[in-house]
């Protein structure tokens, strides 16, 4: 006796997807996942549309060294009646310029800019260049003029001056952590672009050459000679502001101490090409005690005989790896520290490029 095919047998075979169809389904699903991840990464790095203010502008600089995304904040004073100063703020590792955990929210420069009347520029690093969004200040390929990140960021600064008719003699750069290292690099590779440099939790030019276990083997003068050489025929005294936490375990206080000595030596070499203290600098230090939940700190000013700034340094007690200030919003802020953003702007305002 024979039996006809069961309904199950006859119905299942024709409806089973072919191998090609399964490949289409899997490929399509993967494409959706990749697109979603890409959008998520973009949102983290570049922010969301509603995070932009009315006076914020997003741009992409294109140059010989590649492309660079950045956001500009225009203060109310940008009305065509005067050429405004520019502050470029460079974020640290695991941060962005204007997305998640941003330099914009950490520094609160926009509010200060609206009061004081300067343009703010926030470049942002992409994970395609560094997987944790650090600026590559420890890589020699990004420590020279006309190449790498220095060329990109100097190009951004020049583009902002041109686009927004800003004052080229008052373009300043500030950075945090790896961004501070990049800011210092810009000070020696593009002294003709940046009037002052501010380093918060950063180190000297060529810090990657210094052995953390034997730092004395590479004195700050050695790296200072390299920094001065990078300046070339554009060499000039570039004022530097240094802010360093005494409890910083990422960038130890010794790195900040070396940076002050390094930059003083760079300026000494600029004067006559010799490490001979020809500038005859004056050093003054004052201590500010902690009170009402605020960190104590010391402020050291190193000035030339004419009173012009060489280095100004803040050492903040009980502060770790952070940008200090009362209003900062981010993973690397310290509300008990002095107001780094206000200090930076006051320093920049009295030190235009001469």
Predicted regions and their residues:
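A domain-start/cap signature at the N-terminus of enzymes
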Residues: 2-86, 101-107, 111-119, 171-174, ...
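Active-site glycine-rich loops that stabilize anionic/oxyanionic intermediates
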Residues: 84, 92-95, 319
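Structural cue for short, hydrophobic secondary-structure segments
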Residues: 89-92, 122, 242, 315
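Cap/lid segment of the alpha/beta-hydrolase catalytic domain
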Residues: 122-148, 210
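Alpha/beta-hydrolase active-site loop
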Residues: 141-164, 185
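Short glycine-enriched nucleophile-adjacent loop
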Residues: 180-192
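A conserved short beta-strand
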Residues: 193-208
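Short beta-strand/loop motif that positions the catalytic acidic residue
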Residues: 242-244, 248
């Amino acid at each position: 006796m024979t039996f006809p095919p069961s309904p199950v047998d006859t119905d299942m075979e024709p409806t089973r997807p072919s191998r090609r169809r399964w490949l289409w389904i899997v490929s399509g699903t993967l494409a959706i996942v990749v697109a979603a991840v890409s959008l998520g990464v973009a949102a983290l790095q570049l922010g969301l549309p509603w995070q932009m203010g009315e006076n914020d502008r997003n741009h992409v600089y294109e140059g010989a060294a590649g492309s660079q995304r950045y956001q500009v904040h225009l203060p109310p004073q940008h009305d065509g009646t005067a050429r405004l100063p520019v502050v470029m703020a460079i974020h640290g590792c695991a941060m962005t310029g204007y997305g998640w955990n941003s330099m914009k929210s950490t520094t609160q420069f926009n509010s200060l800019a609206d009061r004081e009347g300067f343009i703010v520029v926030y470049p942002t690093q992409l994970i395609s260049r560094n997987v944790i969004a650090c600026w590559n200040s420890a890589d020699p390929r990004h420590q020279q003029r006309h190449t790498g990140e220095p060329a990109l960021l100097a190009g951004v600064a020049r583009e902002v001056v041109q686009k927004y008719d800003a004052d080229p003699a008052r373009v300043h750069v500030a950075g945090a952590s790896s961004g501070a290292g990049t800011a210092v690099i810009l000070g020696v590779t593009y002294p003709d672009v940046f009037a002052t440099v501010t380093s918060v939790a950063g180190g000297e030019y060529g810090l990657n050459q210094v052995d953390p276990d034997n730092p004395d083997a590479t004195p700050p003068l050695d790296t200072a000679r390299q920094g001065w050489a990078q300046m070339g025929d554009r060499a000039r005294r570039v004022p530097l502001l240094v802010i360093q936490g005494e409890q910083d375990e990422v960038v130890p206080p010794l790195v900040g101490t070396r940076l002050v000595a390094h930059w003083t030596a760079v300026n000494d070499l600029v004067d006559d090409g010799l490490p001979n203290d020809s500038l005859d600098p004056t050093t003054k230090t004052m201590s500010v005690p902690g009170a009402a939940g605020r960190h104590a700190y010391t402020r050291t000013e190193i000035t030339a005989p004419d009173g012009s700034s060489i280095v100004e340094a803040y050492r903040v007690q009980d502060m770790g790896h952070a940008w200090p200030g009362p209003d900062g919003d981010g993973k690397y802020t310290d509300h008990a520290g002095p107001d780094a953003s206000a200090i930076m702007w006051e320093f920049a305002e009295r030190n235009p490029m001469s």
